[in-house]
Amino acid sequence: MSAIVEDMYLLSSSMKMEKQFRKRHHSDSSDDDSSSPKSASPSMDDDRRAHHNELERRRRDHIKDHFTILKDAIPLLDGEKSSRALILKRAVEFIHVMQTKLSSQGKAIEDLTRKNELLEERLLERESSGSPSSSRLPALAVSSSQMQLTMPIIPQMQNIAQLSQYPQQANIIAQSTNPAQLDGLIALNNDAILALLGSFQSVSPSLLDSAPGTPPSGFYPCAFSPVDQQMAVKI
């Protein structure tokens, strides 16, 4: 655009100079004719005419060069023979196309900027709030492991609790049961007690002060203390 403006400025300036030159030439010729027609020197007219022709040639070359540059810059004129009027027409069309593209690209950039801002806000919200799922996973794992440990022990401990609540019935059962069955029942109860103590070892290790494989005396049920076991075996 600046080259076109410069060409228009040079064209207007050259036209002004040509008008001034014509006025001066006309005034000089009229003065020479009125005063003395023979006194005008032909060398001065030739110099002025040569100077004017040089200026006009420079102006035309300048305009021609810039039209060539404009033609090369417009992709719509590739391989097409064009006049100056066609070059200017294609240049105007190309300018309109580029303005449309620039406006659409500007809107796309604004949309992308808005989306990036929304994503940054969501990331900040997630970082500030934290992920609740990750904090719940260890608690769920611990509770499930505790349930797996305690579920096999619960039925056996219920049987022990029932025997401890009714010591007379426990003595009758011990007297009427065979020694082999009684030993198996005692071993089953001991295994249940050891499993229970193993589950509590991480909480209070002081419960397992006795020798390994032998449950402490305080955890025997009333019907199956060490004395009752010996009496039952003797019977």
UniProtKB/Swiss-Prot annotation:
Cellular component, GO annotation: cytoplasm; nucleus; RNA polymerase II transcription regulator complex
Gene3D superfamilies: Helix-loop-helix DNA-binding domain (4.10.280.10)
Main location as per UniProt: nucleus
Induction: Down-regulated by fasting.
Cited function: Transcription factor which regulates the expression of genes involved in lipid metabolism in response to nutrient availability. Binds to the E-box motif 5'-CACGTG-3'. Under well-fed conditions, binds to the promoter and represses the expression of lipase genes lipl-1, lipl-2, lipl-3 and to a lesser extent lipl-5, thereby preventing lipolysis. In response to a high-glucose diet, promotes fatty acid synthesis, elongation and desaturation by up-regulating transcription factor sbp-1 expression.
Entry keyword annotation includes Nucleus: yes
Phenotype reported upon loss of the gene: RNAi-mediated knockdown causes a depletion of fat stores. RNAi-mediated knockdown in the intestine causes a fasting-like transcriptional response, characterized by the up-regulation of the lipl-1 gene transcription.
Subunit annotation: May form homodimer. Interacts (via N-terminus) with skn-1 isoforms a and c.
Highest taxon listed in the record's lineage: Eukaryota
Gene Ontology BP terms: insulin receptor signaling pathway; positive regulation of transcription by RNA polymerase II; regulation of fatty acid biosynthetic process; regulation of transcription by RNA polymerase II; response to food
Record region (Helix-loop-helix motif): 61-98
Organism, as annotated: Caenorhabditis elegans
InterPro entries in the record: bHLH_dom, HLH_DNA-bd_sf
Gene name in the database record: mxl-3
Official protein name in the record: Protein mxl-3
UniProt record similarity statement: Belongs to the MAX family.
